[in-house]
Design a protein with these regions (language model features):
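An anion/pyrophosphate-binding glycine-rich loop and adjacent beta-alpha core
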Residues: 185-187, 194-335
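Glycine-rich loop(s) and the adjacent beta-strand/alpha-helix scaffold that form part
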Residues: 133-136, 140-214, 264
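Glycine-rich phosphate/pyrophosphate-binding beta-alpha loops
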Residues: 203-208, 258-264, 384-390, 417-431
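Redox-cofactor-proximal catalytic regions of oxidoreductases
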Residues: 1-45, 53
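Short, small/polar residue-rich loop motifs at catalytic or cofactor-binding pockets
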Residues: 177, 238-240, 387-389
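A glycine-rich dinucleotide-binding beta-alpha-beta segment and adjacent secondary-structure elements
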Residues: 115, 336-426
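Conserved redox-cofactor binding core of oxidoreductases
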Residues: 31-136, 157-158, 208, 219, ...
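Short, well-ordered coil/turn residues at beta-beta hairpins
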Residues: 130, 142-143, 148-150, 248, ...
């Protein structure tokens, strides 16, 4: 509708590169070739049937700035992002449930998947579920097959620590659904399905925490598995801006103009696996120039009022700090002794690089450098915020689950976060 043409071959290559080749390109092609049809199907339900507007981002707002390729890797992203206007009607899932019910079907939400059932030929014939109300078991027969869409395993610390020790070690906050405990993945594996061997967490650099807090799990009596991440704020969106980042020694350690998860992985090599973001009074002005894309764009698009609310939330939790001088900010952030001296010297050096409009130290594009000279000065400590996991059950291009010999499992289909064969190492995210 907007006249935008996507280079499908380049997009396939980009997704494969992001996964270091650890994907099935035929599965990726299914997404590339059929995602538009799927969006059209959902839009027909949401807009034409229920009058809810589908909205999308395109053009400059969703386009990767060409200047990044002068120094950084030349990333490529699909130019149109679809979502729906929440203000124009009922919640999306409520409308989809209504659509299902109008077709004569029903959904039972008060169940938990216990196991898959299969016949003597190995075909999946149904499931055993357990009631979340009184724990009784229910058998569902499925003559045409079973489609599992049970989400990932971010809410299961046992699986996180075993399957993704690196991602777990750099995470400070969570924005996932606690219900995503990996039960669907476990049931499929018990039935003989093949689980991807590479972790693929969806990490955002927005896990704001108080000074002195390390990344990784802490004990929690109220959390599933007795463990939780320490952050009190699910996602601190202003954290996804390419401002100066330093470790606990006050040292800069990476190019901050990078995809969401790159800086948190770089912090895996730093004390406590956390880092501090430093900026000044020109935060929003700088953010508009940085022009990050994706969901991080809401900080620049919503402006000063939104930023002020985010700051207030951070201050209430003892995680965000304002100061009239850099020395005062260093004290509030917990820098002492040699670390404080190094911090102040790092800021001075960063200002020099800004004046030169040339990042001689780490190669950040000039338009994403910023001066740190105008009070008030801002600072906070950050790690990763875990949204979900994408390490899932291996599938073919038809969505069929594969067994450990990579052969289709008759009667079993996988979709959503629990499907695999697509991602590895990380989730392709924006900058």
């Amino acid at each position: 509708e907007q006249g935008i043409q996507m280079d499908r071959a380049k997009l396939l290559s980009e997704i494969s590169r992001y996964a270091s080749g650890k994907c099935d390109q035929r599965v990726v092609k299914t997404w590339i070739n059929e995602s538009a049809e799927m969006i059209g199907f959902v839009r027909e339900i949401m807009t034409e049937k229920y009058g809810v507007n589908m909205i999308y981002t395109y053009g400059d707002e969703a386009k990767w700035p060409a200047e990044n390729a002068e120094h950084n890797t030349d990333y490529m992203y699909p130019e149109i992002e679809y979502t729906y206007d929440r203000s124009s009607g009922a919640a999306r899932n409520e409308l989809l449930l209504q659509y299902i019910q109008e077709l004569g079907y029903d959904v039972d939400f008060k169940t938990s998947l216990a196991k898959l059932e299969k016949n003597s030929d190995g075909r999946i014939t149904g499931i055993i579920a357990q009631s979340t109300e009184d724990d009784h078991f229910i058998r569902y027969n499925a003559n045409q097959g079973v489609l599992l869409a049970c989400g990932g395993f971010p809410g299961n610390p046992y699986m996180m620590e075993q399957l993704d020790p690196l991602g777990t070690s750099v995470t400070t906050a969570c924005s996932y659904s606690p219900a995503d405990k990996g039960y669907g993945i476990r049931a499929a594996v018990w039935a003989g399905a093949n689980l991807d061997k590479e972790a693929a967490p969806m990490l955002f650099d927005r896990g704001i925490v108080a000074p002195g807090v390390d990344a990784g799990y802490v004990d929690s009596d109220s959390a599933f598995g007795g463990k939780a991440f320490p952050g009190k704020i699910r996602q601190f969106n202003p954290g996804t801006q390419p401002f100066l980042k330093v470790n606990r020694n006050g040292e800069r350690f990476a190019n901050e103009s990078c995809p969401y998860n790159d800086i948190v992985y770089a912090a895996a090599h730093q004390p406590g696996r956390v880092y501090a973001q430093i900026s000044d009074a020109n935060f929003i002005e700088d953010a508009k120039r940085f022009h990050t894309i994706g969901c991080s764009a809401q900080t620049r698009n919503l402006g000063e009022d939104y930023f002020a609310q985010q700051v207030e939330n951070g201050e209430k939790e003892g995680c965000f700090f304002k100061a009239d001088t850099l020395e005062e900010l260093a004290d509030k952030m917990g820098f002492t002794g040699a670390a404080k001296d190094t911090f102040l010297a790092t800021v001075e050096r960063y200002n020099e690089l800004y004046d030169k409009q040339n990042d001689e130290d780490f190669g950040k594009p000039a338009y994403r450098l910023s001066a740190i000279r105008t009070a008030p000065f801002y600072g906070c400590w950050l790690g990763a915020s875990l949204l979900t996991t994408e390490q899932g059950i291996a599938i073919n291009e038809k969505g069929q689950a594969l067994d450990t010999n990579n052969q289709p499992m008759e009667g079993l289909y996988i979709t959503g976060d629990m499907s695999g064969s697509f991602f590895a190492n990380n989730y392709p995210c924006l900058m």
